[in-house]
Amino acid sequence: MAPSLSPIRSHHVAVIGAGAAGLVAARELRREGHSVVVFERQKQVGGTWIYTDHIEPDPLSVDPTRSVVHSSVYGSLRTNLPRECMGYRDFPFVVRSGVSESRDPRRFPSHGEVLAYLQDFAKEFAIEEMIRFDTAVVKVAPAAEEGSGKWRIESTEKEKKKWAHRAV
C-alpha cells in the first residue's frame, strides 16, 4: 500500500521583490494554498525591467545622503534572448491580441515590452493584490522564538514595520 500524503499546511510566506522570479514565486505559493505577501520597493511590478532615465547625482558615492537610483536598464536595451525563451510555460511571451498597438512584436523585445509582459502576468493571476508597493525590506533574520521556523522581516513604508513569516 502506498504511503498516504499528508496535506500541505498553509503558511504565511514572504516574497521579496515583484520582478520576474518574485511574481511567479508568489503565484505558485498561493496555488499551494499559502498566504503570500510580496514586498516591493518600487511603485510597480517589473523588477530590473523598470526603466528610469534618472541618474545618480553622486556617481562616485561620496555623499552618504545621496539619492540612489536602482536601475540597470538603459533606454535602447533589447533582450539578448528571444521572447520564446523568456515566457512562463503557462503564460507564453507572445504579442497578445486586443492590447495596445504600441507593443513590440519583435522576437528580441525591448525592456518596455518585457515590463508590459510582467504587468500582464501580474494582472492575469491577480498578484498585485498580494504586493506591498513602496516597501523596502531592510532586514531579515530568524525569529526570536527558537525552533519556530519563522523569520522576522523589517521593512520601511512610511514607517518601519516588523513582520513574522514562516518562509522568505
Swiss-Prot record:
Its EC number is 1.8.-.-. One of its GO terms (molecular function) is N,N-dimethylaniline monooxygenase activity. Pfam families: FMO-like (PF00743). InterPro entries: FAD/NAD-bd_sf, Flavin_mOase-like, FMO-like. The keyword Metal-binding does not apply. FAD binds at residues 17-22. SUPFAM superfamilies: FAD/NAD(P)-binding domain. Keywords: FAD, Flavoprotein, Monooxygenase, Oxidoreductase. Its cofactor is FAD. Transmembrane segments: none annotated. Belongs to the FMO family. Catalyzes the conversion of methylthioalkyl glucosinolates of any chain length into methylsulfinylalkyl glucosinolates. This is Putative flavin-containing monooxygenase FMO GS-OX-like 11. It comes from Arabidopsis thaliana (Mouse-ear cress).
